[in-house]
Amino acid sequence: MSQLSRILLLNGPNLNMLGAREPKHYGTLSLAAIEANVQALAAKNNIELECFQANSEEKLIDKIHQSFKKVDFILINPAAFTHTSVALRDALLAVAIPFVEIHLSNIHKREPFRHHSYFSDVAEGVICGLGAKGYECAFEFAVEFLAKKA
């Protein structure tokens, strides 16, 4: 029997406030509800999914490093770190785990400082502006990506 594929869902700063934080941009679902939706997809697809959220760059980097040779794919919403964190980008490059960048809002329809991402050019794909549905789309892509590698 083959080993389960492992996917890590990472969420960056302030995403623990989803549901209460700026619903116009981020919707009304909590992070727990989004994670539960993705966990349900993981169960249907026989995928091991770990969810992790941190407001600190250091904790996110440590989690990425701990995933080295233990995780097959990463789904990441770097949140505000999208526009500032070379260190987080470098951590993803160091572990060489394929990943998809996710954003609830369309960062290109927002303030100009949100238009640049330090992750997009090294991600397998970028999903933005689809709200919580973007997490499901990213998960489905990861499943297809891993199936092609198998």
UniProtKB/Swiss-Prot annotation:
Mind listing the UniProt keywords for this protein, alphabetically? Answer: Amino-acid biosynthesis, Aromatic amino acid biosynthesis, Lyase
Keyword Lyase belongs to the record: yes
Catalyzed chemical reaction(s): 3-dehydroquinate = 3-dehydroshikimate + H2O
- Pathway of action: Metabolic intermediate biosynthesis; chorismate biosynthesis; chorismate from D-erythrose 4-phosphate and phosphoenolpyruvate: step 3/7
Q: Quick one: which residues bind substrate?
A: N77, H83, D90, L104, S105, R114
Q: Which GO terms describe its biological process?
A: amino acid biosynthetic process; aromatic amino acid family biosynthetic process; chorismate biosynthetic process; quinate catabolic process
Cite the active-site annotation.
Y26, H103
Q: What class of enzyme is it?
A: lyase
- Where is the site Transition state stabilizer? R21
Pfam families the record matches: DHquinase_II
InterPro entries, sorted: DHquinase_II (IPR001874), DHquinase_II_CS (IPR018509), DHquinase_II_sf (IPR036441)
User: Which family does the entry's similarity section mention?
Assistant: Belongs to the type-II 3-dehydroquinase family.
Q: Explain the purpose of this protein.
A: Catalyzes a trans-dehydration via an enolate intermediate.
User: How does the annotation summarize its subunit structure?
Assistant: Homododecamer.
What is the official name of this protein in its record? 3-dehydroquinate dehydratase
